[in-house]
């Protein structure tokens, strides 16, 4: 988990309360806490939706779908209860932004959940944390309990008759797969966490069969800030089709790893060299994973690109979940590829044959390759397997495993060939430094 740090280029909107003790409800109230919810109650659902659409906010979990539009898909009238589901199952390797949000500003997540509920007519919200974040559950549960004690949750919230909203917290059991929204609903319903066939989509038939809004934790926590500052003002912080700011967790070989809030469209090069301080020990940049492990890798020559959904797509990769992993010249791409596919093979739910068998065969081939027993046909087979996984699974996990694999093979083929010819450079193992829980809470 990177440290909480700061840089002059940051535009602090969602992170403005970080380091201020805002997990305490009194501290949160001193900083405009729950003010946006009061406004939302007074002005109504149509106003909320208009501001969210004007903000240009796009989903911060990776898909990048416009949030205001997503909320507007929920039918106004439903025979079944409506729900809001916050996806806090942050499990993408290299991603850690939501962790900081839950730790530093849990009430923003609660307030955003309430605002989404008011916008779509839901009376119940669920906040789902990944299994490995179980120690954050105490923080969220205390924040929820404090909100109930203040009359901000439950019946007649803020003293408004008929305005009711409840929040339930839940943790997973450590499966990456349940970060996919339909698998998340299955898990929350007590079933095996595997994806559903769609359509129907969650906005119409979701949790327990009712219309459901599902948003990433960072996405939902932006809602109160947007209502307070105005959707248009928020949009102007970013680019034309990518409104606002975003939390980026910059890790790997940089001088100042940490979670930073940068405007959408900010230069990836500047994020690495200015914000995060560049590559330590005089080493050269080799490659960057720009948005979490599922995003195709960029070489050192490809980092003059803006950090937004559209510019990343033009560069042949994705903004993903905001986890920027920087690799210096000492990193073996073959080893990095093996570590990446090991994760996806382990986390595949096994539901779809292309994902289940494809990840396993790629892992086996890369393992043999890394041990020095590969050949040129293996390189072609790895690419062939990855290409035939693309678009052939119920959920995006198959693509998430295939896309980075294709990037490794296509952009660093010579490095793979060096393993065959015995000319490879010996690289030190990538060291993973564990950070204890007490250090996390105090790392300001």
Predicted regions and their residues:
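Cofactor-/ligand-binding subdomain signature composed of acidic, glycine-rich
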Residues: 1-49
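Gly-rich Lys/Arg/Thr-decorated short loops/hinges at beta-loop-alpha junctions or inter-strand turns
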Residues: 28-35, 86-98, 202-207, 249-254
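Histidine-anchored nucleotide/phosphate-binding helix
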Residues: 105-119
């Amino acid at each position: 988990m990177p440290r909480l740090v700061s840089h002059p280029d940051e535009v602090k909107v969602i992170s403005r309360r970080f380091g201020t003790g805002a997990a305490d409800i009194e501290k949160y109230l001193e900083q405009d806490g729950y003010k946006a919810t009061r406004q939302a109650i007074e002005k109504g659902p149509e106003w909320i939706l208009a501001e969210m659409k004007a903000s240009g906010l796009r989903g911060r979990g990776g898909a990048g779908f416009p949030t205001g539009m997503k909320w507007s898909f929920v039918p106004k009238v439903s025979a079944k209860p409506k729900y809001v589901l916050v996806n806090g199952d942050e499990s993408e390797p290299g991603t850690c932004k939501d962790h900081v949000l839950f730790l530093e500003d849990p009430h923003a997540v609660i307030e955003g959940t309430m605002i989404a509920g008011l916008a779509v007519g839901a009376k119940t919200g669920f906040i789902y944390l990944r299994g490995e974040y179980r120690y954050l559950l105490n923080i969220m549960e205390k924040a929820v309990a404090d909100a109930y004690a203040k009359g901000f949750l439950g019946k007649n919230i803020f003293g408004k008759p008929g305005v009711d909203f409840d929040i339930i917290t839940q943790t997973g059991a450590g499966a990456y797969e349940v970060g996919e929204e339909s698998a998340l609903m299955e898990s929350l319903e007590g079933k095996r966490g595997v994806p559903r066939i769609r359509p129907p989509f969650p906005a119409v038939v979701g949790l327990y069969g009712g219309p459901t809004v599902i948003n990433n934790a960072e996405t939902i926590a932006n809602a109160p800030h947007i209502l307070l500052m105005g959707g248009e003002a928020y949009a102007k912080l970013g680019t034309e089709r990518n409104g606002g700011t975003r939390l980026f967790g910059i890790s790997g070989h940089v001088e100042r790893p940490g979670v930073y809030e940068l405007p959408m469209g900010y230069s990836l090069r500047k994020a690495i060299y200015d914000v995060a301080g560049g590559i330590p020990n005089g080493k050269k940049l080799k490659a960057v994973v720009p948005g979490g492990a599922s995003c195709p890798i960029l070489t050192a020559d490809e980092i003059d690109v803006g950090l937004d959904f559209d510019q990343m797509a033009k560069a042949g990769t994705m903004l993903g979940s905001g986890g920027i992993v920087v690799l210096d010249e000492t990193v073996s791409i073959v080893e990095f590829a093996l570590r990446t596919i090991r994760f996806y093979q382990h986390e595949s739910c096994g539901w779809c044959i292309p994902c289940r068998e494809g990840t396993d065969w790629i892992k086996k081939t890369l393992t043999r390759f890394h041990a020095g027993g590969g050949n040129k046909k293996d390189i072609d087979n790895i690419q062939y397997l990855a290409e035939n996984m693309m678009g052939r699974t119920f959920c995006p996990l198959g693509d998430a495993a295939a896309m980075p694999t294709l990037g490794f093979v296509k952009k660093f083929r010579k490095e793979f060939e060096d393993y065959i010819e015995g000319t490879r450079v010996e690289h030190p193992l990538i060291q993973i430094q564990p950070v204890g829980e007490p250090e996390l809470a105090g790392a300001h």
